[in-house]
Design a protein with these regions (language model features):
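Formylglycine-dependent sulfatase
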Residues: 1-174
């Protein structure tokens, strides 16, 4: 490994069009992502062999196709993967941290990350599970409920987020 290894920030968004960045000529305002793109590497010919969130994350995590992970649609990421990118980066001396939606089972499995902070979009698979986002939300909006915005986690329509922008899950994740 080089004396000063490069910093790696991998951002994976659900259902994000490849051209939906200001730096790609889109009128959307995305200054922070544009800066990361200009100072880092912007992949313009990316391809997802399975354009669904959980299978796509499994492919990225393992370096395998959906046919090899067994995830051709929504389902659980295999628990025992031979190779996992976060663990491989750990083995090279990197500190790895996952934040946001993972949709793994069990939900707190780390898949090689040193730490994870989870926002599971309201998905609770174990009685004792509480997402880190919801804990944070309660600290910042006591008595509030992130599910009262009128916008579902997987709605097919857009809407205005009715709470303060600072409380949005995307803001928390970033």
């Amino acid at each position: 490994m080089a004396a000063t290894p490069p910093h790696i920030i991998l951002i994976m968004t659900d259902q994000h069009r490849g051209d939906a960045l200001g730096c790609m000529g889109n009128p959307v305002i995305s200054p922070n992502l544009d800066q990361l793109a200009s100072e880092g590497t912007l992949y313009t010919k990316g391809y997802s062999s399975c354009p669904s969130s959980t299978p796509a994350r499994a492919c990225l995590l393992t370096g395998q196709s959906p046919w090899h992970t067994g995830l051709l649609g929504y389902g659980n990421v295999p628990v025992n993967c031979q190779y996992e990118m976060p663990q491989m980066l750990r083995d090279l001396g990197y500190y790895t941290f996952g934040i946001g939606k993972m949709h793994w089972h069990p939900q707190r499995i780390k898949h090689g990350f040193h730490e994870v902070l989870l926002d599971e979009s309201g998905r609770i698979e174990a009685e004792n599970f509480e997402s880190d986002y919801r804990k944070w939300f309660q600290l910042n909006c006591p008595g509030g409920n992130p599910d009262t915005t009128g916008i579902g986690w997987n709605d097919h329509q857009a809407g205005i987020y009715k709470l303060k922008e600072e409380l949005h899950p995307t803001r928390w994740t970033s």
